[in-house]
């Protein structure tokens, strides 16, 4: 019997919705990255995008443990000399919580074209409403929440 290698046409994608309220950011990011990569499926292969779509709601209510909210920094670089910019996570979460969640998940995906393709299946929203009701997303429960 030959080893099965999934083809992009063989993959059936589902939609999952994750409520980020009172969930630790790192735990949320690892769960979402695993679903985006398709590691929860028996046909997982690292060289094929077998992942599902992920909708994250209540991104503004995500929790950071310890003093990370005030001490952890988010960095970006413009590409020019001296172009390193940094912002504290509490400022980033207040100004643009969707970007903070996307940045955490993006760091857990492959750093190549396949990772960018996986990241395009991630949808993050600030409130508890999302425009993807027609796709009939299944709720995905993260059992361990912040204390």
UniProtKB/Swiss-Prot annotation:
Cross-referenced CDD domains: Ribosomal_L13 (cd00392)
Keywords: Ribonucleoprotein, Ribosomal protein
UniProt keyword annotation of Ribosomal protein present: yes
Domain of life: Bacteria
GO molecular function: mRNA binding; structural constituent of ribosome
GO cellular component, one term: cytosolic large ribosomal subunit
Classification via Pfam families: Ribosomal_L13
Alphabetical list of InterPro entries matching this protein: Ribosomal_uL13, Ribosomal_uL13_bac-type, Ribosomal_uL13_CS, Ribosomal_uL13_sf
Entry function: This protein is one of the early assembly proteins of the 50S ribosomal subunit, although it is not seen to bind rRNA by itself. It is important during the early stages of 50S assembly.
Quaternary structure and partners: Part of the 50S ribosomal subunit.
NCBIfam families: rplM_bact
Protein name: Large ribosomal subunit protein uL13
Source species taxonomy: Bacteria, Bacillati, Actinomycetota, Actinomycetes, Kitasatosporales
